[in-house]
């Protein structure tokens, strides 16, 4: 018996008040639907079917890299109707697991428990007990605790509304059972929809065993219906990430002001992360790294004993051990800091390598530049890499000293141990071991007077 997963992602999401389909909104930097697909893949199914509706072509275009089978639900006629669109693609002997594209934090542990505890010919649902179950379907049990049916909130009687045990919608049974039950559903309810939950009563009626597995916590089965629910779930997720990192030896100064946006975030012990730090995409931080407040790191690797000072923005960079960056530095894609390099305040780098022990301490732009070892780049230095049509490279060799307020008009090379005088504008190579100055000689104009203002 193989496993087929059906993810229902056809909800209209009107309460999101957004032109973006609900399932494309991110949680922890990853679209809601992608999170559910990633969890489903951990169960090793042979196929993942996604039933989409609202904004379907846009959803498929944005998430076309996901290894799923896309199925359109052309009319929003309910969850039962949505599963009916996918079930013909499942083999009769398949075990089918039904998930939801807007329930992003369901855990593999809970799903494995559901699959393991549901009889091969039975039906299993994930249930949860909530302090406020308003709006959710209630689990109806008999006097012996057996599940009899699921009643949607809008269709529930007054005594049923007092029940706090709810249906999460997550369900498993065989494809053969679903092919038998789904055509029997009707839409005689307040919403005039075909409810998937009505299959529970059909299962009970024919003596099929029905069981419930409790969710580990309420948040893992929390659906996203509006922006506020998404915001609350985001903070819960970030607290989980902060706790996980803290227990692994990372100091998070304030878990409420920490954001991890991506799945591939690896942080070694003894790293310290200050407030309002955002880690996005693939981020690796080695031992004893210190990240100051208000720092953004995206797709970046940072070596041990390096300090990133406040208000620095770093994307797609490699920073090796014992470096210092910032405050107020910007490292754009392709930037590499070799061991012991230093980038100070208001320095911007793009596709530039700063060699071992080299420094660019302040007020500098380095674009398309290769800098050797032990180079000093003075304040106000600019590598002029763009001629209006093409980008050109600057090379600064080992031991060079670049004075303040220097413009290096690429392409050119500054030789080994060369010194460039402050205020120079170079458009040709500077030879090694020499002082190169390219500026007008200072002069004083005798007898000059400032003009006087007219009355």
Swiss-Prot record:
Question: Enzyme group, top EC level?
Answer: transferase
Q: Where can this protein be found?
A: Cytoplasm
Hey, which family's this protein in? In the N-terminal section; belongs to the N-acetylglucosamine-1-phosphate uridyltransferase family. In the C-terminal section; belongs to the transferase hexapeptide repeat family.
Q: What is its EC number?
A: 2.7.7.23, 2.3.1.157
- Pfam family example for this protein? Hexapep
GO cellular-component terms in the record?
cytoplasm; membrane
Region of interest (Pyrophosphorylase), residue spans:
1-227
The chemistry this enzyme catalyses reads: alpha-D-glucosamine 1-phosphate + acetyl-CoA = N-acetyl-alpha-D-glucosamine 1-phosphate + CoA + H(+); N-acetyl-alpha-D-glucosamine 1-phosphate + UTP + H(+) = UDP-N-acetyl-alpha-D-glucosamine + diphosphate
Q: Keyword Acyltransferase: yes or no? A: yes
Catalytic residues in the record: 362 (proton acceptor)
How cofactor binds (record note)? Binds 1 Mg(2+) ion per subunit.
> What are the record keywords, sorted?
Acyltransferase, Cell shape, Cell wall biogenesis/degradation, Cytoplasm, Magnesium, Metal-binding, Multifunctional enzyme, Nucleotidyltransferase, Peptidoglycan synthesis, Repeat, Transferase
Which annotated residues bind UDP-N-acetyl-alpha-D-glucosamine? 8-11, 22, 73, 78-79, 100-102, 137, 152, 167, 225, 332, 350, 365, 376
Q: Name one GO biological process term.
A: peptidoglycan biosynthetic process
Q: For acetyl-CoA, which residues are the binding ones?
A: 379, 385-386, 404, 422, 439
Q: Which residues bind Mg(2+)?
A: 102, 225
Q: Can you tell me which residues the record assigns to a coiled coil?
A: none
Q: Where is this region: N-acetyltransferase?
A: 249-455
Known partners and oligomeric status: Homotrimer.
GO MF entry, a single one: magnesium ion binding
Q: What role does this protein play?
A: Catalyzes the last two sequential reactions in the de novo biosynthetic pathway for UDP-N-acetylglucosamine (UDP-GlcNAc). The C-terminal domain catalyzes the transfer of acetyl group from acetyl coenzyme A to glucosamine-1-phosphate (GlcN-1-P) to produce N-acetylglucosamine-1-phosphate (GlcNAc-1-P), which is converted into UDP-GlcNAc by the transfer of uridine 5-monophosphate (from uridine 5-triphosphate), a reaction catalyzed by the N-terminal domain.
The upper taxonomy is: Bacteria, Pseudomonadati, Pseudomonadota, Gammaproteobacteria, Legionellales
**Identification of the protein by name:** Bifunctional protein GlmU
Q: Which cofactor does it need?
A: Mg(2+)
Region: Linker; residue ranges are: 228-248
Q: Has the keyword Metal-binding been applied to this entry?
A: yes
């Amino acid at each position: 018996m193989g496993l087929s997963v059906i993810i229902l992602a056809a909800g209209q999401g009107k309460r999101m008040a957004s032109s973006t389909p609900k399932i494309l909104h991110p949680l922890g930097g990853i679209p809601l639907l992608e999170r559910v697909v990633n969890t489903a893949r951990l169960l090793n199914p042979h196929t993942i079917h996604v039933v989409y509706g609202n904004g379907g072509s846009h959803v498929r275009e944005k998430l076309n890299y996901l290894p799923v089978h896309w199925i359109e639900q052309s009319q929003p006629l309910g969850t039962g109707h949505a599963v009916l669109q996918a079930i013909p693609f499942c083999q009769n002997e398949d075990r089918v697991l039904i998930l939801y594209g807007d329930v992003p934090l369901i855990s593999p542990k809970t799903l494995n428990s559901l699959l393991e505890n549901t009889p091969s010919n039975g039906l299993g649902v994930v249930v949860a007990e909530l302090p406020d179950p308003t709006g959710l379907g209630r689990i109806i049990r008999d006097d012996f605790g057996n599940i009899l049916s699921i009643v949607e909130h809008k269709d529930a009687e007054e005594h049923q509304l007092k029940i706090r045990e709810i249906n999460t919608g997550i369900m498993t049974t065989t494809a053969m059972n679903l092919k038998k039950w789904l055509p029997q559903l009707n839409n005689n309810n307040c919403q005039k929809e075909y409810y998937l939950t009505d299959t529970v009563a059909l299962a009970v009626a024919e003596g099929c065993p029905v069981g419930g597995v409790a969710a580990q916590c309420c948040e893992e089965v929390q659906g996203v219906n509006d922006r506020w629910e998404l915001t609350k779930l985001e903070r819960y997720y970030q607290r989980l990430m902060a706790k996980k990192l803290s227990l692994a030896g990372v100091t998070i100064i304030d878990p409420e002001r920490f954001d991890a946006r991506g799945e591939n975030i690896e942080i070694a012990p003894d790293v310290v992360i200050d407030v309002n730090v955002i880690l996005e995409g693939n981020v690796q931080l080695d031992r004893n790294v210190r990240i100051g407040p208000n720092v953004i790191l995206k797709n970046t690797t940072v070596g041990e004993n390096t300090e990133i000072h406040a208000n620095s923005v770093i994307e797609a960079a490699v920073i090796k051990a014992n470096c210092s960056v910032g405050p107020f530095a910007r490292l754009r894609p392709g930037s590499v800091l070799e061991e012991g390099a230093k980038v100070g305040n208001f320095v911007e780098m793009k596709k530039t390598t700063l060699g071992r022990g080299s420094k660019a301490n302040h007020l500098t732009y380095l674009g398309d530049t290769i800098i050797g070892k032990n180079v000093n780049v003075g304040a106000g230095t600019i590598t002029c890499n763009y001629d209006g049509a093409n980008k050109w490279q600057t090379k600064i060799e080992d031991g060079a000293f670049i004075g303040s307020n220097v413009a290096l008009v690429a392409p050119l090379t500054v030789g080994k141990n060369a010194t460039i005088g402050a205020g120079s504008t170079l458009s040709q190579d500077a030879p090694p071991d020499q002082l190169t100055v390219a500026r007008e000689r200072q002069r004083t104009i005798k007898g000059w007077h400032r003009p006087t203002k007219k009355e």
